Amino acid sequence: MKLSCGTSFAFLIMFLFAAQSMHVYAGSFHKDVQIHWGDGRGKVRDRDGKLLSLSLDKSSGSGFQSNQEFLYGKAEVQMKLVPGNSAGTVTTFYLKSPGTTWDEIDFEFLGNLSGHPYTLHTNVYTKGSGDKEQQFHLWFDPTVNFHTYCITWNPQRIIFTVDGIPIREFKNSESIGVPFPTKQPMRLYASLWEAEHWATRGGLEKTDWSKAPFTAFYRNYNVEGCVWANGKSSCPANSSWFTQQLDSNGQTRMKGVQSKYMVYNYCNDKRRFPRGVPVECS
């Protein structure tokens, strides 16, 4: 079909608008995030903005946030966690909306004594309510090398992956009354902070401040998502993550990780839910 000049121009405008709405950040910590707390404890480490560190001492932790908000997206980063005795520390990478009825999707790494594994804590909040925790002990030492952690959030599901391996899927079950984050745009956040009252063995192990400052590293930050601007998000479904689901191989890999490395699943906690586990668990 031959296009007129006017039709071609209109098509170009539509294409440019779609390209702006579905934005890919091949991540620069200089350009795409701001270190919003920590009083100098968060630092971009290289000229290209590919490596950032967050530190924690007895006075304060630190954190950064994305400049843009997104309504759906795929966010990933490589992290190397605090080595040695990290008891009482929490290192995070998560999505969150503002307000008192916020939505949130969490990767939280709970520190431990030397020689004991980190606990990877995942959770999903909708309208300020969470209580959907799954926890894992990783199959590697996350303090030795960088590993890739990814959150894929689309209208159908949320997928958590570690080094490309799915560890958790939280499906949209609004049809049976389970809230799902579909309406509130979120920013990407990362932080390193102290939570010795609960983070390690329920607060039994306290932070050894003689080991401070504690430092975690982030690199190769990347976000592909639907940018929220001027009260709306136009998001064409032309990117693989927007309709991503786990095929049979992905399901098998996820179940394998869960059977070997999952240490807590709210869906199995009958003591916590004596009247029956949440409906999405069945």
Swiss-Prot record:
Reaction catalysed by this enzyme? breaks a beta-(1->4) bond in the backbone of a xyloglucan and transfers the xyloglucanyl segment on to O-4 of the non-reducing terminal glucose residue of an acceptor, which can be a xyloglucan or an oligosaccharide of xyloglucan
Q: Where is this site: Important for catalytic activity?
A: 106
Sugar attachment sites are 112, 238
Q: In which tissues is it expressed?
A: Root specific.
Q: Which residues act catalytically here?
A: 104 (nucleophile), 108 (proton donor)
- Signal sequence residues: 1-26
**EC numbers, comma separated:** 2.4.1.207
Q: Say yes or no: keyword Glycoprotein present.
A: yes
Function (record text)? Catalyzes xyloglucan endohydrolysis (XEH) and/or endotransglycosylation (XET). Cleaves and religates xyloglucan polymers, an essential constituent of the primary cell wall, and thereby participates in cell wall construction of growing tissues.
Provide the protein name.
Answer: Probable xyloglucan endotransglucosylase/hydrolase protein 18
Q: What is the originating organism of this protein?
A: Arabidopsis thaliana
